[in-house]
Swiss-Prot record:
Belongs to the MIP18 family. Gene3D superfamilies: 6.10.250.1280, Fe-S cluster assembly (FSCA). GO terms for cellular component: cytosolic [4Fe-4S] assembly targeting complex. The lineage of its organism: Eukaryota, Metazoa, Ecdysozoa, Nematoda, Chromadorea. One of its GO terms (biological process) is chromosome segregation. SUPFAM superfamilies: Fe-S cluster assembly (FSCA) domain-like. It comes from the Eukaryota. Residues 1-32 are annotated as: Disordered. It comes from Caenorhabditis elegans. InterPro entries: FSCA_dom_sf, MIP18, MIP18-like. Signal peptide: none annotated. This is MIP18 family protein F45G2.10. Keywords: Chromosome partition. May play a role in chromosome segregation through establishment of sister chromatid cohesion.
Length: 160
């Protein structure tokens, strides 16, 4: 792809977080239930490939642990992920959001509810994109579209 066709030809790169966090005593205790938390969700999505650049969403600071919230009660677990496109007019924002959502749907228990949206104020059409990402029928239809799923799977592909 030629540089003139990129939305953001020179994205800023950020350092990656350490792969391992300190292990607490309760995490070592197999008799204690270890509920999912924001770090685990971040670890699932940090290596998603950007559709436009040869970098991960973490390297581009599109996903950040601080923008992930996990709510757990007796009835359900709810995961909310905000992501921040590198530029306010990023044409790949919907694809990035869909890739995050698909990765979580494939990785988490089906009972876990997932919400993926653009960080408020970070994109010129965030309301429209957030509506699309929240619409279960549109997401299901997108997952049936072979061309779109090829693009999503490329984002989710693990480098060799």
């Amino acid at each position: 792809m030629g540089q003139e066709r990129l939305d953001n030809a020179n994205p800023t790169l950020f350092d990656s977080k350490p792969r391992h966090r300190p292990v607490t005593g309760t995490e070592r205790d197999e008799s204690v239930e270890d509920p999912i938390d924001s770090w685990e969700i971040f670890d699932l999505i940090r290596d998603i490939n950007d559709p436009e650049h040869p970098y991960t969403l973490e390297q581009l600071n599109v996903v950040q642990e601080e923008l992930i919230k996990v709510f757990i009660d007796e009835e359900e677990t709810f995961v909310k992920v905000n992501f921040t496109p590198t530029i306010p007019h990023c044409s790949m924002a919907t694809l990035i959001g869909l890739a995050i959502r698909v990765k979580l749907l494939r990785s988490l228990h089906p009972k876990v509810k997932v919400s993926v949206s653009i960080t408020p104020g970070s994109h010129s059409t965030e309301e429209s994109i957030n509506r699309q990402l929240a619409d279960k029928e549109r997401v299901a239809a997108a997952m049936e579209n072979q061309g779109l799923m090829h693009a999503v799977n490329e984002c989710l592909r693990v480098p060799e």
